[in-house]
């Protein structure tokens, strides 16, 4: 079959196509594709192509929403440190109105702003977007720009 007594062919590859160092002829390691990811999409350090490991955190300890590992446990994000009550944790996606009221950092926002936020948050698409996407960014957006819409 062309394999020597160690199981390697004349090019130095075993029957699975890997050499003694565990690389195939394209230079990829056993179990990893040419981009360095395994069948589950993680590379050898445990991060997927988005830079997240199997628990959903990247090398900086943030998940895809930008929340650190402490977020789950303590309800704090790295960005806002432990001095702030977490802005989203206690509320589900249908509770934006009271969330905004109770936890607004913009103490000076007027009634008009507040009503606009409530009204806007009732819109299904917006609510979905707000819930699913980057809370950190949205949070800043709301507050930096006042109405923000």
From Swiss-Prot:
Keywords: Repeat
Compositional bias segments (type: Basic residues): 125-141
Sequence ranges of Basic and acidic residues compositional bias: 105-124
Keyword Membrane included in the entry's annotation: no
Transmembrane regions listed in the UniProt entry: none
Keyword Repeat carried by entry: yes
Protein name in UniProt: Putative eggshell protein
Annotated segments matching region Disordered: 105-149
Sequence repeat copies, ranges: 1-5, 6-10, 11-15, 16-20, 21-25, 26-30, 31-34, 35-39, 40-44, 45-49, 50-54, 55-59, 60-64
Coiled coil: none
Taxonomic superkingdom: Eukaryota
Region of interest (13 X 5 AA approximate tandem repeats of Y-G-Y-[DE]-K), residue spans: 1-64
């Amino acid at each position: 079959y062309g394999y020597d007594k160690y199981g390697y062919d004349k090019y130095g590859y075993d029957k699975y196509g890997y050499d003694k160092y565990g690389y195939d002829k394209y230079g990829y390691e056993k179990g990893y594709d040419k981009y360095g990811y395994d069948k589950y999409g993680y590379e050898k350090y445990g991060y997927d192509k988005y830079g997240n490991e199997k628990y959903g955190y990247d090398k900086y300890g943030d998940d895809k929403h930008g929340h650190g590992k402490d977020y789950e446990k303590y309800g704090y994000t790295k960005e806002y440190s432990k001095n702030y009550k977490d802005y989203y944790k206690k509320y589900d996606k249908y509770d934006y109105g009271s969330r905004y009221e109770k936890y607004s950092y913009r103490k000076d926002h007027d009634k008009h702003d507040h009503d606009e936020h409530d009204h806007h948050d009732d819109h299904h698409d917006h609510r979905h977007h707000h819930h699913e996407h980057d809370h950190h960014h949205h949070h800043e957006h709301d507050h930096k720009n006042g109405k923000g819409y």
